[in-house]
A protein has these predicted regions:
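N-terminal catalytic cores of secreted or lumenal carbohydrate-active enzymes
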Residues: 1-99, 108-110, 137-140, 252-256, ...
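C-terminal domain-boundary segment and adjacent tail
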Residues: 8, 46-55, 60, 136, ...
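Surface-exposed loop and adjacent secondary-structure segments within mature catalytic domains
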Residues: 67-74, 95, 128-180
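Alpha-helical scaffold elements lining the catalytic groove of polysaccharide deacetylases
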Residues: 89-107, 176-195, 560
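CE4/NodB-like, metal-dependent polysaccharide N-deacetylase domain
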Residues: 97-130, 134-137, 190-204
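C-terminal (or distal) subdomains of carbohydrate-active enzymes
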Residues: 131-134, 156-158, 183-193, 217, ...
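Alpha-amylase-like alpha-glycosidases and glucanotransferases acting on alpha-linked glucans and related
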Residues: 158-205, 209
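Metal- or metallocofactor-binding catalytic centers and their adjacent structured scaffolds
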Residues: 246-364, 383, 415, 707-716
Length: 800
């Protein structure tokens, strides 16, 4: 007869319908209760995940922490999960999942002498297809989840092998019924026993008061001891999975979806902040490693770890899913603010450290101040004013750089004159100081390059021409009208009715990458709650942004900008369409003044074919276009069109269109409740975002473009000095075209660099790279995540 393993637990949401301070209290009280029950019920065992909870207890109550350590040693307290908490399992990037394991498993090993063997995300709203490999390379062979249910996923398997694209497998258990069986629902244990007998396989039943903590109570344990159900055993997940060894199990490949499709896009603030913080921390790590290599400056490990923990905490599924109360997002904002402050400080320290050691004098004497010298830039008659442009990306990058200066000439590191463009700045400091300069920089992989500005002393505001709001340039290599913009690579046309792109022609490929006019539209989602429970679609179309106003903002040798403003109901949409010289994509900067309740803003692109490729953690997934709302990462592609975004995670496909979800006017934490005067609506007011439209070639290229969109080049205005560094440097080189590098950081155990990448095209091949002067030769299996030290030694995601 099949056994039922009784798993004592307490599902604890540190944030949901309460703030984290209350969550802290519930964790403390629940852990105390579990320890007390162990004294009263010798057979009772307790299972708990989430490294952040243990860290709170360690800091707040060392005596309780010592008790937990002893119970872990006895085998009565089981540590599962191996992550900082139970995150949303669709939205975080691959590196976030890697840091969940890195920071948590090492903590468990240090404090308890064990690591989690079982992944544990019982309440997360879906699970991306890359998780089996991530789990395996984080030291976990098993996985416990509950959502989606058998009915939601349309699959009957509850115990199975879950396999990712590279072939990695974990044993997975889908919790039947509930993760928090309490005294009033003990009959469910009998039902689970019947199901286990019917399927002839052992199963688990999870008992204990949950959501707001609590765990197994005296009453519950007393009643469980009186159950007349045979073959029950007090257990922990590791014990259960050990009993499955050698058994034949079905194999499920791909993602585990769908539950609560509205969570891919609810609360735009938390989604955008997550992407911004992830991108900045990854850039800070790369810049810090560059500075360490070039200047010897110390790598800020502890500060970056603190910042990563902030990001990981905010990835908790009820926070990141957008379904918590409004004050919870104020708290999330505080963590994001601290994270961005740390990231920006460390980026600045790294860049200043490098810039200060570059030989900007080039053998010339130090300049002396002369009357008429530019008032807020260092200036040298022969050398101009140096600008050091930095690239954190591990590939050569060409992007525009915006300077708060107006020179008359610019040169690159070789002294070659380069084009630049005077544009209107964002300041109005009198008539003299309201302009900026834009130029297109080319910087090597994880490198820098010095550019120089030269000023004409007699230049004044009267020499700048401004006609009809358009800043005139000396040359005009880009063609732009109100309804069309063009460079040597693409031509972009606008629809006079919708005020949106209606054609993008790829000159190099000789193809159109759109099949008609794009649209900005509203969906009526009155029937949805915040989660969009039991809804495949967010709603039906109920409004369209039209009556466009066209305005050419910029034309010049570097870029052209057309601003198009449209309205719908009470909302206004302002979009700047930007085409740069040398770019094969059109960048769109959006400012939406959104005042819609129970409505969703979507941007629709007519390019969908039978499938859509979407970025997921450390990889991609190809989905059939079935119409429903789906999760995505930093880019999606269907047919010839690719769309990169800077913080949007949901899309759908319908009637030949891919529709990116931008904003949702849902009620905070509304589970089909009363919608009255007390209801507070999310995403109201002004929101900004960006997206990039371009021709799709392959996943490796798409990853690069998305990373560049989310973190552009940085620059430092420099002075004059000698130094050991040249005016151009690159710290990375890679010959392989089918990998995406996601991280370059300092190893956890030593002083070596660590580089991580994943294979993008589903084909094995050689990988040759050079990192900080050290050559690395290895191979990448299809869809493999690989972590290497600079000497070529392979380690897992825990760097073991």
């Amino acid at each position: 007869m099949a056994k039922v393993h009784l798993i004592g637990n307490a599902h604890i949401d540190p944030v949901w319908l309460w703030r984290w301070q209350e969550g802290f209290s519930e964790i403390r009280a629940t852990f105390r209760s579990a320890l007390d029950r162990m004294k009263e019920f010798p057979e009772f065992k307790f299972t708990s995940a989430c490294a952040s909870y243990y860290q709170w207890i360690e800091k707040m109550d060392p005596e309780m922490f010592a008790e937990i350590k002893e119970r872990v040693k006895q085998g009565r307290w089981s540590i599962v999960g191996g992550w900082f908490l139970q995150p949303d399992c669709n939205i975080p990037c691959g590196e976030s999942f890697a840091r969940h394991g890195l920071l948590s498993q090492r903590y468990f090993q240090e404090k308890f002498g064990v690591t989690a063997k079982t992944g544990y995300n019982v309440d997360s709203f879906g699970h991306n297809a890359g998780l089996p490999q991530i789990l395996k390379k984080s030291g976990m062979d098993n996985y416990v989840f509950m959502r989606p249910s058998v009915e939601e996923q349309g699959r009957e398997e509850e115990v199975f092998y879950w396999e990712s694209a590279d072939g990695s497998r974990v044993k997975a258990y889908r919790i039947p019924e509930l993760y928090n069986i309490d005294a009033g629902r003990l009959s469910l244990i009998g039902e689970i026993k019947s199901r286990a007998d019917q399927k002839d396989i052992d199963m688990m039943a999870f008992y204990g008061v949950g959501n707001h903590g609590g765990g197994p109570t005296i009453r519950l344990l007393d009643q469980m001891g009186k159950l007349k159900v045979p073959d029950l055993v007090y257990s922990v997940p590791d014990q259960y999975f050990a009993g499955l060894e050698g058994k034949e199990l079905p194999v499920l490949k791909g993602e585990l979806q769908h539950h609560a499709r509205g969570c891919y896009s609810a609360c735009s603030f938390v989604k955008t902040s997550n992407r911004k913080c992830e991108s900045h921390l990854l850039a800070a790590e790369k810049f810090a490693m560059m500075a360490r290599h070039l200047t010897g400056i110390r790598y800020p490990k502890k500060k970056l770890e603190k910042a990563w923990k902030n990001v990981l905490f905010n990835q908790f599924h009820d926070i990141m899913g957008g379904c918590s109360i409004r004050p919870a997002y104020e708290d999330a904002g505080y963590l994001y603010g601290e994270t961005m402050s740390i990231a920006e400080q460390e980026i600045n320290y790294a860049l200043q450290s490098i810039a200060s050691r570059i030989d900007t004098l080039q053998g010339e004497a130090l300049p002396s101040y002369k009357e008429g010298t530019h008032w807020h830039s260092w200036e040298h008659e022969a050398l101009g004013t140096p600008v050091v442009v930095f690239n954190p990306h591990p590939w050569e990058t060409q992007m525009s750089v915006n300077l708060n200066e107006v020179p008359v000439k610019m040169t690159d590191w070789e002294g070659k004159e380069i084009p630049f463009q005077i544009i209107r700045g964002d300041q109005t400091n009198g008539n003299q100081d309201k302009y900026h300069t834009l130029f297109r920089a080319e910087v090597g992989a994880m490198g820098y390059a010095v550019y120089r500005m030269f000023f004409r002393k007699e230049a004044g505001a009267e020499e700048r021409k401004e006609e009809s709001g358009v800043l005139a340039a000396e040359t005009n290599r880009l063609s732009v009208t109100e309804h069309q913009m063009e460079n040597d690579l693409i031509r972009v046309e606008f629809d006079s009715v919708t005020g949106d792109v209606c054609r993008i022609y790829d000159k190099k490929a000789g193809r159109d990458i759109l099949r008609g006019a794009c649209r900005a539209l509203l969906l009526d989602e009155t029937r949805c709650d915040t989660w969009a429970h039991n809804q495949e679609y967010l709603g039906k179309e109920c409004g369209y942004f039209t009556v466009p106003e066209f305005q050419i903002l910029e034309r010049g040798p570097v870029r052209a900008v057309v601003r198009i403003t449209t309205t719908c109901h009470a909302s206004t949409l302002q979009r700047d369409f930007i085409l740069e010289e040398g770019s094969s994509g059109v960048l769109v900067k959006v400012k939406a003044d959104f005042h819609e309740k129970h409505k969703t803003l979507k941007f629709a692109f007519p390019a969908a074919e039978k499938t859509t490729t979407a970025a997921i953690a450390f990889g991609t997934i190809v989905r059939e276009n079935l119409g429903g709302e789906e999760p995505c990462g930093a880019w999606i592609a269907s047919g010839p069109l690719a769309i990169a975004n800077d913080g949007k995670y949901g899309y759908d496909t319908t009637e030949g269109e891919v529709r990116l979800t931008i904003l949702r006017g849902a009620v905070y934490a509304d589970h089909y409740g009363d919608r009255d005067l007390y209801s507070e609506y999310m995403d109201q007011g002004v929101h900004e975002c960006s997206y990039l439209l371009y021709g799709y070639t392959d996943a490796a290229d798409a990853e690069k473009r998305a990373q560049e969109l989310n973190f552009p080049l940085r620059h430092v205005m420099e002075s004059f000095h000698g130094g050991a560094l040249e005016e151009k440097e690159s710290c990375f080189f890679c010959e392989s075209d089918h990998i995406a590098v996601t991280a370059v950081k300092l190893s956890e155990d030593g002083e070596e660099a660590v580089v991580r990448f994943f294979e993008t095209e589903g084909r094995s091949g050689k990988v040759t790279m050079e990192l900080f002067g050290k050559r690395i030769e290895t191979t990448a299996a299809h869809n493999e995540i690989k972590t290497l030290k600079a000497d070529g030694t392979e380690v897992n995601l825990l760097e073991w």
